[in-house]
């Protein structure tokens, strides 16, 4: 078939790509391109009226994002198989699940890939929290059978994700040797409530889509 050019301007929506492709009669081609920062104009002029209006909202946003929400006594870091940041995030999800759904889950699961920044020691601002959690994920409450939950933990031997307190997982030689929730071995016939995010349920990487019930925030 015909060759189709596929181009990309990078990531995070920083640039707009502009490309010219020149074709002559014998099929030879040449091209030129440039990257245009999305915060600039083609003619480099700044509209004073728009800049004034944007400045007002920028100041309001800055005030909100710089608001101190809490204090972190020690830095929260990512880690594998477990890190303090991921464990804190998963434990926080347990508390949030109680507020949002009125249910205390048996465990909470988040994903390392979704934690995009670490939290240093000191004051924690709203901006810090958005840096850690930049995605618009929904909190999801699932009910899984013990059999499906065991399948999930089997996959954790390869792709470890942060878990809430109360989960003990022993992995050796790439395989799960033992797992317990709340100090008890998992009963394959029992049902467990898991708090997670919609992304992990729909990613297809785990058995979370085998849930018997689901609620989204």
Predicted regions span which residues?
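Short Gly/Pro-enriched turn/cap motifs at secondary-structure boundaries
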Residues: 8-12, 82-84, 130
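Hard-cation-handling environments
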Residues: 37-124
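Feature captures C-terminal
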Residues: 3-4, 15, 87-217
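Active-site-adjacent helix-turn-beta-strand microarchitecture at beta-sheet edges
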Residues: 1-64, 156, 160-163, 170-179
């Amino acid at each position: 078939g015909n060759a189709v050019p596929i181009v990309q301007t990078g990531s995070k929506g920083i640039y707009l790509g502009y490309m010219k492709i020149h074709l002559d009669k014998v099929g030879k081609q040449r091209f030129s391109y440039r990257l245009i920062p999305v915060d600039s104009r083609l003619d480099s002029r700044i509209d004073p009226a728009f800049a004034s209006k944007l400045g007002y909202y920028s100041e309001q946003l800055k005030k909100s994002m710089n608001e101190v929400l809490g204090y972190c006594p020690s830095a929260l870091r990512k880690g594998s198989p477990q890190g303090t940041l991921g464990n804190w995030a998963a434990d926080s999800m347990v508390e949030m699940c109680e507020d949002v759904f009125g249910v205390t889950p048996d465990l909470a699961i988040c994903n390392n890939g979704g934690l995009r920044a670490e939290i240093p020691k000191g004051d924690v601002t709203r901006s810090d929290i958005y840096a850690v959690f930049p995605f618009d994920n929904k909190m999801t409450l699932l009910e899984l059978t013990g059999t499906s939950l065991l399948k999930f933990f089997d996959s954790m031997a390869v792709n470890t994700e942060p878990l809430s307190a109360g989960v003990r997982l022993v992995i050796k030689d790439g395989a799960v040797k033992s797992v317990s929730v709340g100090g008890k071995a998992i009963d394959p016939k029992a049902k467990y409530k898991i708090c997670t995010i919609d992304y992990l349920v729909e990613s297809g990487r785990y058995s979370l889509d085998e849930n018997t019930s689901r609620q989204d925030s």
